Every structure is written in C-alpha cells, then in structure tokens.
C-alpha cells in the first residue's frame, strides 16, 4: 500500500481528485451484471477474449465492448466491471431421455462440475431434482428445486461465483443484488485505473444513481437516454432533464433509440484515442452505431437539455453538441482532471528528487 500523493502536494482545480495513471485517462470501464468471471474488474484487449470467458455475442456487455473496439483507432483495452448477483434461476430448455445435463459452478474456493444423466422417462422436474441432489452439499451456495426451476443463492451476500451450463439448460435474466454505489465501491477497491464509465442498464434509477456517484469522483460517466420524452422540450421529468437539473458536470448523455447500440462506448473509445485537451466530442464519426433520425425540433429539445445526438448529415453520421449535463464541454472536464493529476505528480517528483525546495522566487 502506497501513501497518497496529496498528503504532500494537494492541487485543487475546481474538482476533487483521486489518483489515475496517464493511461487511465484513456481507459473505459463498462459496468453490468454477469456470471462469467470472479473478478470485480476484468481487462480485455478484444471481444474474442470475452467469448472465451463465457460471454455470449448477444450479451449487453459484449455489445457495449464491441462498439468500443469497433472504433478507428481502437482502444488497447476495455475493462468490464461486474455487478454482484446473489441468486439465479436455471431451467431445462430441452427435455430428453438418457441425456447429460451439466452445471459448472466456481467460487474463489474452487471449481466443481455437476452432471446429471436423465432416465428413459425424463421430465423437467426429475432433471432439476437430480441436479439439486448433486449440488445440495455446496459449501457457499444454497441450491433449491422449485416449479421446474433450480435456484442458486449465495449463503453469504456478496460471494462471487460463476456458472456455466450445458446447451440443454438455460438461465433466466440475472439481476444485480447490490446498489450501484456498492458496485462502484467494490470496483474502485479492486481496480481504480480507469476514467470513463458506461452502464449497460438504461433504467432511470440506475443512471441517476451512477451520475450521483460519479460527481464525487474523478471520473466521467456516459449514458444513453432512450425515453421519447427527452425529445420534448415541454417535459422536464425525463432522465436528460433530471441530469441537467442536478447540474452534473461529470455525466454526459446521448439520445438513442436502438437498445443494442452503445454510442456512449463508441464515443469514449473514439475520443480516448486522443490526448486530453486535444479532442472535441462533437462531430465524431462512430463505427458500428446506427444514427437516429431526428427532426430539428427534437434535436433542439435534446440539446436544450444538454444532451448529445448521433445523426446523419448527407453522407456521414456524426455526433452533435459534445457537452456534459451541466453544459460544460466534455473535453474541458477531461483535460482539467488530467491537468490536475499531472501537476500533482510532477510537483511530487520535484519534491522527492531534489534535496530542498527553497521558498524563494
């Protein structure tokens, strides 16, 4: 454990700070639920590695990372932050006689395969009950069979586990069992070397919670708002309006209607390829993202709420506005954070590398 530099050199440029490496100011973290790795933060250099870890090409986290890696130039790394899931439900998707059904369960204490062979008179109930009998003695996971479903629940909240299923079994959509503040506290305790944050959830409560958390940290949160109300200037209860009314300097949002596109991840990747202060977040082309068709009235409503758009202009699609929810330019916030960290590190290096710093002109 190393002491914090600001004990010796404390630099304040309007915003508070925590330590990030130079590389970290160009690193994106995508946050979402998954059961594919035990680590809170996993670093990937391409999407193929995500498939090897058990992600599916239809998973939101995969799609978000794919939009980031699709940009030119592409990022060297993208980090995936895991939200804790404490319970899941597994069901039989294909009932067959004399067939093997396999679940691989891993915790930090070890990995175990559970394989059940169905009888000549197989049913979903007998298969689930057979798997439950095999898994019942697990030290960290409670396994119960109910209504043709196998429920796996951690005995202690927060226990990390991964699950891999044979193709004849399926898992219901998983839900996080912790708040976003708890998620981010666990993530930064594991790996704080990132700057951009994206969230696969587009729920209003999740976006507002992460925006609030980000405002107290040296990070930048980008999100998508898909509410039609965001395009209406007379409505002030949509996510975009609420982000503006809270005056969030560290959050920017794009209006986008395609649920499988993550333009915020694409924009992060595109702009993070440029050194802090040398970029603008407007007028950027985004590979792999479908442009929205907006009327001028809708565009003006969005930008009046300090939102951003990705639209077609003749034969090219580009981003528009380039501002945070508080109305500040996104590049100004990133450069300010980078400059603050740069000054602190450089002054600290002078202090430790010189015998004495005289207090003279």
Please name every model-derived segment:
Residues 83-87, 106-108, 170-179:
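Surface-exposed cap/loop segments at beta↔alpha junctions
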Residues 66-86, 151-163:
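Extended, compositionally biased
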Residues 84-96, 180-186:
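Disulfide-bonded cysteine-rich modules in secreted/extracellular proteins
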Residues 1-62, 66-76, 309-310, 314-361:
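Structured, hydrophobic secondary-structure cores that serve as assembly/anchoring elements
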Residues 29-31, 104, 150-153, 193-202, ...:
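Short, hydrophobic/proline-enriched secondary-structure or compact coil segments at domain edges
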Residues 144, 155-219:
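Long, acidic/polar, low-complexity amphipathic helices and coiled-coil-like
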Residues 133, 188-353, 361:
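A glycine- and small-residue-enriched flexible loop/hinge signal that marks low-structured segments
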């Amino acid at each position: 454990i190393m002491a914090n530099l600001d004990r010796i050199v404390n630099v304040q440029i309007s915003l508070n700070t925590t330590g990030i490496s130079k590389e970290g100011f160009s690193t994106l973290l995508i946050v979402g639920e998954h059961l594919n790795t035990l680590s809170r933060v996993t670093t990937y250099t391409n999407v193929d590695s995500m498939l090897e870890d058990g992600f599916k090409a239809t998973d939101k986290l995969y799609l978000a990372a794919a939009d980031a890696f699709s940009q030119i130039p592409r990022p060297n790394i993208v980090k995936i932050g895991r939200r804790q899931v404490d319970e899941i439900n597994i069901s039989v998707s294909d009932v067959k006689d004399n067939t093997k059904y396999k679940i691989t369960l891993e915790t930090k204490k070890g990995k175990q395969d559970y394989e059940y062979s169905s009888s000549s008179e197989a049913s979903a109930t007998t298969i689930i009950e057979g798997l439950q009998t095999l898994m019942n003695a697990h030290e960290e996971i409670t396994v119960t069979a109910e209504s043709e479903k196998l429920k796996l629940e951690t005995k202690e909240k927060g226990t990390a586990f991964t699950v891999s299923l044979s193709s004849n079994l399926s898992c219901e959509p998983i839900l996080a069992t912790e708040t976003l503040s708890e998620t981010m506290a666990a993530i930064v305790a594991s790996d704080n070397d990132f700057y951009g944050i994206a969230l696969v959830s587009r729920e209003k409560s999740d976006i507002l919670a992460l925006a609030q958390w980000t405002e107290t940290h040296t990070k930048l949160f980008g999100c998508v708002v898909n509410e039609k109300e965001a395009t209406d200037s007379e409505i002030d209860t949509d996510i975009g309006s609420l982000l503006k009314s809270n005056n969030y300097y560290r959050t920017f949002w794009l209006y986008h209607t395609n649920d499988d596109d993550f333009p915020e991840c694409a924009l992060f990747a595109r702009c993070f390829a440029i050194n802090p202060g040398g970029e603008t977040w407007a007028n950027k082309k985004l590979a792999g993202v479908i442009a929205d068709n907006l009327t001028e009235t809708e565009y003006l409503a969005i930008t009046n709420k300090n939102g951003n758009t990705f639209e077609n202009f003749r034969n090219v699609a580009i981003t528009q506005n380039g501002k945070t929810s508080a109305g500040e330019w996104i590049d100004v916030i990133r450069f300010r954070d980078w400059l603050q960290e740069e000054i602190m590190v450089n002054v600290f290096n002078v202090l430790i590398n010189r015998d004495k710093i005289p207090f003279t002109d």
